[in-house]
A protein has these predicted regions:
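Regulatory N- and C-terminal appendages and interdomain linkers associated
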Residues: 41-256
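Catalytic activation segment of kinase domains across protein kinase-like and atypical kinase folds
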Residues: 2-4, 8-67
Length: 256
């Protein structure tokens, strides 16, 4: 659920990493079109736009490399296009592998089309309720293949409860084709779905304590917690929670 905020060409490295993080965040409530820069009113760098922006940036890079690819300009363009055309499949393959892991699914037990649809429908349900991204996957990693009392905690995240309950039934139907048991599946999901993320309101609290009061203890506690974000730690429940309305960081710019 990470949003760079301003993922333009100078913030994307040829090493395959985005850099220069300013108005960035790990999402709290999920929205396809969530942005994290107050000046991004058109949603150019929205969460769902990031894959396309990645390709756009690579096209700009390819344009600068055309003189090195071939002496003939049209031939150079063809070479660049041949490589750029592989981006979509490579991205979608990596995305599906990551999302399957988050949902405890394996490639051999379901088709790519089916599993892509299952993931997409979950994101739609999350979007409709603005369900917390991290907590949703964390709760799913605690559920069994059969309904149990743990379902209720996950359902509380969804204002559109029935939509999530319907999706949950489809997910469990898909799980029946998996060969691993609940314990192994849950362990795998918990290894890729963090319990804690650096939520913006917690980062802001650490900054305010340090700058306003010279108190770095809030920063050190948060920093220590995030060294092992996949393991639930006693007494740290508050770090799992999304912000209260008055805690939300609503204005972010480059440099914040």
């Amino acid at each position: 659920g990470f949003i760079h905020g301003v993922m333009n060409t100078d913030n994307m490295s040829v090493a395959g990493e985005t850099i220069d993080y300013g108005p960035c965040a790990f999402m709290d409530g999920y929205r396809h079109e969530r942005v994290f820069s107050s000046i991004d009113r058109q949603g150019r760098y929205a969460y769902s736009s990031q894959p396309g922006i990645g390709l756009w940036n690579l096209i700009r890079l390819a344009e600068t490399l055309l003189p090195l690819l071939a002496i003939d300009g049209s031939e150079a363009v063809k070479i660049a296009e041949r490589y750029l055309e592989t981006y979509k499949d490579q991205y979608e393959s990596a995305w599906l592998a990551g999302m399957r892991a988050k949902l405890g699914l394996t490639a051999g037990a379901g088709s790519d089309e089916e599993d892509r649809g299952l993931v997409g429908s979950l994101l739609d349900v999350m979007d409709a309720s603005e369900a917390d991204f991290t907590l949703t996957f964390d709760h799913l990693g605690r559920l069994g293949a059969d309904p149990s009392g743990h379902d209720e905690e996950a359902c509380k995240l969804f204002a559109q409860r029935e939509q999530f309950v319907d999706w949950l039934a489809k997910w469990r139907e898909r799980l029946k084709r998996e060969t691993q048991g609940d314990a192994a599946r849950q362990a795998g999901m918990q290894a890729v779905n963090p319990v804690y993320i650096p939520r913006n309101h917690q980062i802001e609290a650490a900054i305010r304590a340090a700058e306003d009061r010279g108190d770095f203890s809030v920063f050190h506690e948060l920093h220590a917690l995030l060294q092992d974000p996949y393991v639930e730690q006693p007494g740290k429940e508050r770090f799992r929670l999304p912000p209260e309305p008055e805690e939300m960081v609503t204005r972010t710019f480059c440099g914040t």
